[in-house]
């Protein structure tokens, strides 16, 4: 039985999330509200909302958890070529927090294979825009010839980044945004990006699963650290474009 949370009810222990033998593995709780205070509390505990229009707010903590370690990001030869072009050609820009609501709306409208509709509802956009205004949500945006052609958004507390969604209106535009984010996080020494759930696309870029217990332990430590700066641009990509580029090994378990 999934517990229903009233406005003042705390989240149950994450170990009570539904298991793999159920129809909704990782489902922890449901509620009627998506208040910013509830959303912040969720992220600090390694919990995230995911639901569709017409459903209550559903809160998840899957086991295992999909992550991307910046030091393990895979740059294919074709992506490296693209990143070099982005660095070389002035019509390409990567902007941070220039149009956060616009990126969210674009992610909501992006077609997803095997998915009808979107989980990025108006309520979700309002809640995450509130986090953006408080400095805890960010967008990384790929621009070409003055037009936004791709990007991603996510949540950040301390030295932890929680990826939410990405979109592309031009080839590799979302990968350019992700690579720029990864390069910045590597530069800052950040060890983990939360990717929530396993997809073949994320796996192709170096994403992998870890046990929920290890994920939550890392989150608790990382969110207690001072926040990292969020001013950067495409120049950080230079660290990813060399043939022998490498980052220090991470301490994240395999």
From Swiss-Prot:
Keyword flag Cytoplasm: yes
GO biological process: protein catabolic process
Main location: cytoplasm
Recorded GO CC terms: cytoplasm
Single GO MF descriptor: leucyl-tRNA--protein transferase activity
Localization of this protein: Cytoplasm
Keyword check for DNA damage: no
EC class of the enzyme, as a word: transferase
Entries under NCBIfam families matching the protein: aat (TIGR00667)
Family: Belongs to the L/F-transferase family.
Stored PANTHER family: LEUCYL/PHENYLALANYL-TRNA--PROTEIN TRANSFERASE, LEUCYL_PHENYLALANYL-TRNA--PROTEIN TRANSFERASE
Protein purpose: Functions in the N-end rule pathway of protein degradation where it conjugates Leu, Phe and, less efficiently, Met from aminoacyl-tRNAs to the N-termini of proteins containing an N-terminal arginine or lysine.
Identification of the protein by name: Leucyl/phenylalanyl-tRNA--protein transferase
